[in-house]
Amino acid sequence: MSFIAAAAQYPIDRLPDWQAYRAKLTGWIERAADGGAALAVFPEYGAMELASLDPATMGDLGGSLASVSALVPRVDALHAELAALHGMHILAASAPCALADGRYVNRARLFTPAGAVGVQDKLIMTRFEREEWGISGSAPLRIFDTELGKIGINICYDSEFPLLARAQAEAGMELLLVPSCTEAEHGYWRVRHGAQARALEGQCYAVHAPTVGMAEWSPAVDLNRGAAGIYTPPDGPFPPSGLLVAGEMDAPQWLFGAIDLDHVAALRADGGVLNMRDWAEQPGGGSLPPVEVVDLR
């Protein structure tokens, strides 16, 4: 199976009203469709621009959590509409979502053209999220069985912990999505190196989509550095560098790349090396977190 994936280098804008957000998202999806994308990947915390719709709380960390979380059902309805309209799988920008017990989680949602929705919460919080922002990690870890293959999601920092993606790979994952939000180049490179390592270990693709640009009005996502990338194992039919395509640093844009899952199957069966098969031979390589397989076909 082969298709085009699009990874967003997405700017956090100050928006005057809901219609401005709707127009922005619709335009981005239309451009992805014009590029032939069957899968569009938005970044971590891209939804925080919705905090600007409430000027009274947009400058407050706690207040912005509540205001954005309240809009998530409306945001999700728009994504579902656009996924159906364009026949596209869309990973929405992650958003803070309130749980019944009062905690907030960082949640990514994967929409299919047929109307199915898969949810992956971030498991491991950064220092800012846990010490200043009050966002909690949340299990379970999942993969999603879709018409585009078996997809896993590691939100930003999660990609820096190899057992998560390894467990997803053993559950059948062929394509890892890595939405990110990093305020400095150090963070961007940590996530990029993590995503590339996960692609090498799991002999799979990794699609990395970051936020970019300045949003000085926001105390949460004021600085955003990064470049999108699609990473592969450095073996077989893939580039020697393991870098399929990379975007221009900090520039708002879509990055397009061709995904061929037949290459993943072939490499896992008969690659120059067999990282996927040989994982258990390393000392301590046996115990992995559980993974829930969700049918989105």
Question: Residue spans of the language-model regions?
Answer:
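A short C-terminal boundary segment appended to hydrolase-like catalytic domains
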Residues: 255-297
